[in-house]
């Protein structure tokens, strides 16, 4: 995995990735991981290319073997206030700040980096090229999926365990049928549109009563 990527010549390197920019509900979750070069983990790759069972196994191994790992998040209200890009950067900052070892260098998946007190580099397709970023993507994915499973237990009619909050046909149908929960991102188009429609209908109803 790492042969194609030239690492900076420093001791502690953290990989950072996010999960949950696209869903309509819940937090955007990020992870930061500093791996131990003397305790390698086999099978690290982009979390989206792993089965759920394999992700869960690797997540436990990462937590046991990594020199440091942490999670960061930005809640739906922060996403609505800042927009999803800036909220993701904030969540990444929080993940790095939460590390018990402060890294000398941070490698971030994608083409943007958050403002950090140490040097950082964006790596396109980093979750496939850099072991630390792959590990971060796995931890973030497992954490966010677990949050969706917990939300599914509270609101089984929305089927969150199936679609994980992404705007699938099933999710949009359930959203229209059962309405907007507090955990939804109100600035996201399908949610915003539904709220606008409901508001419009309420106004019409009030107007009819007044007449």
From Swiss-Prot:
GO terms for biological process: DNA replication, removal of RNA primer; mismatch repair. It is found in: Cytoplasm. Its EC number is 3.1.26.4. Gene3D superfamilies: Ribonuclease H-like superfamily/Ribonuclease H. GO terms for cellular component: cytoplasm; ribonuclease H2 complex. Its cofactor is Mn(2+); Mg(2+). Belongs to the RNase HII family. This is Ribonuclease HII.
